[in-house]
Swiss-Prot record:
It comes from the Bacteria. InterPro entries: Ribosome_maturation_RimP, RimP_C, RimP_C_sf, RimP_N, RimP_N_sf. GO terms for cellular component: cytosol. It is found in: Cytoplasm. The keyword Cytoplasm applies. It holds the Pfam family RimP_N. Transmembrane segments: none annotated. This is Ribosome maturation factor RimP. The keyword Cytoplasm applies. GO terms for biological process: ribosomal small subunit assembly; translation. It comes from Bacillus cereus (strain ATCC 14579 / DSM 31 / CCUG 7414 / JCM 2152 / NBRC 15305 / NCIMB 9373 / NCTC 2599 / NRRL B-3711).
């Protein structure tokens, strides 16, 4: 992923999204096969609909076409982050307390790099998870500097 492109797009997208009373969740810029994709994820407390995605897409496309900050041809996709929304900002973790989450760490902790459980707490530097391993429960703490990525987890 090209970090510079995502930062530039975030700067263009943030005021557009805020003007529409939405939240900018994430921006991805990835190459799949021969094609580049610019994915912008938006949300709100009530969720987002196709009209809101279309409005952001139209305004963002106009702004990007005018300034032309991206060196490649690309497909722009604006959508909701879905049920397994990524947790990136402090606010995301705070809102996820009490919910099921999936955490991937940079380094193994007790021999594991993937954890799924209930997020019990988040204090800005550490998360506490309640894991269910077969029939027993175990609390673990993970320092945020060890978290490679985190997302909400859907359970059935």
């Amino acid at each position: 992923m090209d970090k510079k492109v995502t930062e530039v797009v975030e700067a263009f997208a943030q005021p557009i999204v805020e003007e529409l009373n939405l939240e900018l969740v994430d921006v991805e810029y990835v190459k799949e096969g021969q094609d580049w994709f610019l994915r912008v994820f938006i949300d709100s407390e009530k969720g987002v609909d196709i009209e809101e995605c279309g409005a952001v897409s139209e305004r963002l496309s106009e702004a990007l076409d005018k300034e032309d900050p991206i060196p490649h041809l690309y497909f722009l996709d604006v959508s909701s982050p879905g049920a397994e929304r990524p947790l990136k900002k402090e606010k995301d973790f705070q809102q996820a307390v009490g919910k099921q989450v999936a955490i991937k760490t940079y380094e193994p902790i007790d021999g594991e790099k993937m954890f799924e459980g209930k997020l019990l707490s988040y204090d800005g530097t550490t998360i506490t998870l309640l894991l269910t391993i077969k029939t027993r429960k175990k609390e673990i703490q993970i320092s945020m500097d060890k978290v490679a990525n985190a997302r909400l987890a859907v359970t059935f």
